[in-house]
Curated annotation (Swiss-Prot):
Chain positions found as 4-aspartylphosphate: D62
Entry keyword Phosphoprotein: yes
PROSITE patterns: RESPONSE_REGULATORY
The protein's name: Photosynthetic apparatus regulatory protein RegA
Protein keywords: Activator, DNA-binding, Phosphoprotein, Transcription, Transcription regulation, Two-component regulatory system
Primary role: Member of the two-component regulatory system RegB/RegA. Involved in transactivating anaerobic expression of the photosynthetic apparatus. It is a transcriptional regulator that is responsible for activating expression of the puf, puh, and puc operons in response to a decrease in oxygen tension.
A single MF term (Gene Ontology): sequence-specific DNA binding
Gene3D superfamilies reported in the protein's UniProt record: 3.40.50.2300, Homeodomain-like (1.10.10.60)
Amino acid sequence: MAEQEYEIGEDPSLLIVDDDEPFLRRLARAMEKRGFQPEMAETVAAGKAIASARPPAYAVVDLRLEDGTGLDVVETLREKRPDAKIVVLTGYGAIATAVAAVKVGATDYLSKPADANDVTAALLSNGEALPPPPENPMSADRVRWEHIQRVYEQCDRNVSETARRLNMHRRTLQRILAKRSPR
């Protein structure tokens, strides 16, 4: 597949925050070949420190890190540099997490594994082009699961409150969550 040409702009600074070191190094090398100047961090604390000290024009942040959530890095960067283009990566692709990422300031959201071409396209897109419609739309069961997950996250993972909001018994919700939870 041919690489697309994108215009990086005057500031090619890029912060990559991911606790998967081999992926982090591979992505940094690939982004450097594309003209970015990557700076790497493996923790929320390190990512926030870089975002505060030297706010980059671009950022790629993993959602779940060992010491917390990447959304904290997104918030810090958005405060320090409102025009930054931020892409959130996650191995746990769900509508609820995508919505949360965009609400705190991410410009795009990609599920892992995402290659450097996908990341570059997301960072440099102008946001006007709509993504193509899915080839296989979600089933009704999947839509239900996504809705339950979204409400569960809104309730800070409180099962009793989530069950109340969804008008279902707490034990029913616990069974659903246990049955579908990633192992």
